[in-house]
UniProtKB/Swiss-Prot annotation:
Organism for this UniProt entry: Nitrosococcus oceani (strain ATCC 19707 / BCRC 17464 / JCM 30415 / NCIMB 11848 / C-107)
Active-site feature positions: 68, 133 (proton acceptor)
PROSITE patterns named among the record's database cross-references: ARGE_DAPE_CPG2_2
Gene: dapE
Pathway assigned to this chain's UniProt record: Amino-acid biosynthesis; L-lysine biosynthesis via DAP pathway; LL-2,6-diaminopimelate from (S)-tetrahydrodipicolinate (succinylase route): step 3/3
Functional note: Catalyzes the hydrolysis of N-succinyl-L,L-diaminopimelic acid (SDAP), forming succinate and LL-2,6-diaminopimelate (DAP), an intermediate involved in the bacterial biosynthesis of lysine and meso-diaminopimelic acid, an essential component of bacterial cell walls.
Homology family: Belongs to the peptidase M20A family. DapE subfamily.
Protein name: Succinyl-diaminopimelate desuccinylase
Annotated binding of Zn(2+) 2, by residue: 99, 134, 348
HAMAP family xrefs: DapE
CDD domains hit by this protein: M20_DapE_proteobac
């Protein structure tokens, strides 16, 4: 069994459902401390965070990742126990195999190989690990970054191990992410009997024209780096459950995934104008989960693409599609940030898995990136 596979299995065996770490960071720290890293716990609330650094000279290269996982769902739907890692037909099964314990294992073994060969490498290497990525993400990476900034610790390069690959490892790399703006809209009417609509005011009927406008709205055209901004309704709740009662209010939850062509303030203003035009009695709450970020072509993107090409022969595609990541907290510091990890076809699904061979490829890619940036 390879060192990467062994470590990945040990991590998967830790039932670290967010915000629990369940011992993952301890396993990783043990391996990294043996390489000369210095560890520092930065726990906030019920969230475990750790910052491990080797060296004090610039440039500082950071591996960033999360040890928490989403709930596995019904265990009886899995081929294997979600927290008993098992290899079947060349695939490692278990919750977190692809998102992102496989990446974490590959990062550590990449460092072990790199430092064994280049013990006197240039610059510094660090790990930023949190158990609060799959949850609210308020006591995790963002708090560690704030602590580092307060004491003047500057990150130059950051590689986040999110599962970015589509069909084979390295075919897609994220060099940015869209912003995420969520909201909760409550429209109030007057409850009543469905047989007497003139004595009531149905908020669902009142809201329907506004929803049609919102769903058909073109918010922007996107640009060469980002697709157009999208608006999606995720939940609608209204009524008592009875078929003969007009509801007194309706609630919707929605989300914008937005490009750099528009700000979250502009989206808020546009939506409020649409709602006001319909003369609705409404209440609106906003939640900004993250602003869009983009890493421009530079030394990190060059190193990552060269490493992928050298190990796999693939010319990787850079993209900003997909969900948010903790890169949104690191990029505003001025760091170059990219994301590269395993194939994402099974993440957050029953029977999450990763190809065993891909773990070794990923470890080699990570090690090669370090060589390009810290020795050449």
């Amino acid at each position: 069994m390879s060192a990467t596979l062994e470590l990945a299995k040990r991590l998967i065996a830790c039932a670290s459902i967010t915000p629990r770490d369940a011992g993952c960071q301890g396993l990783l720290a043990q391996r990294l401390l043996a390489l000369g890293f210095q560890g520092e716990q930065m726990n906030f609330g019920e969230v475990d965070n750790i910052w491990l650094r080797r060296g004090q000279k610039p440039p500082l290269f950071v591996f960033a990742g999360h040890t928490d996982v989403v709930p596995p769902g019904p265990p009886d739907k899995w081929l294997t126990d979600p927290f008993t890692p098992e290899v079947r037909n060349g695939l490692l099964y278990g919750r977190g195999a692809a998102d992102m314990k496989g990446s974490l294992a590959a990062m550590v073994t990449a460092c072990e190989h790199f430092i064994n060969v280049h013990s006197d490498h240039a610059g510094s290497i660090a790990f930023l690990l949190t158990s609060d990525e799959e949850g609210p993400a308020i006591n995790g990476t963002i708090k560690v970054v704030e602590t580092l900034q307060a004491r003047g610790e500057k990150i130059d390069y950051c590689l986040v191990g999110e599962p970015t690959s589509q069909k084979q490892v390295g075919d897609m790399i994220k060099n940015g992410r869209r912003g995420s703006l969520g909201g909760r809209l409550i429209v109030r009417g007057i409850q009543g009997h469905v047989a007497y609509p003139h004595l009531a005011d149905n908020p669902i009927h009142s809201l329907a024209p506004a929803l049609a406008v919102l769903c058909a709205q073109t918010w922007d055209q996107g640009n060469k780096d980002f697709p157009p901004t999208t608006f999606q309704i995720s939940n609608i709740q209204g009524g008592t459950g009875a078929t003969n009662v007009i509801p007194g209010e309706v609630e919707i939850l929605f989300n914008f995934r937005y490009s750099t062509e528009v700000t979250h303030q502009q989206l808020q203003q546009q939506m409020e104008e649409i709602l006001s035009q319909q003369r609705l009695n409404y209440e609106l709450e906003w939640t900004l989960s993250g602003k869009p970020f983009l890493t421009a072509p530079g030394s990190l993107m060059t190193a990552v693409s060269q490493a992928v090409r050298g190990i796999t022969g693939i010319d990787a595609e850079f993209s900003t599609t997909g969900g948010t990541s903790d890169g949104r907290f690191i990029a505003p510091t001025g760091a170059q940030v990219v994301e590269l990890g395993p194939v994402n076809a099974t993440i957050h699904k029953v029977n999450e898995c990763v190809a065993v061979a891909d773990l070794e490829i990923l470890s080699r890619i990570y090690s090669r990136i370090l060589e390009i940036l810290l020795t050449e």
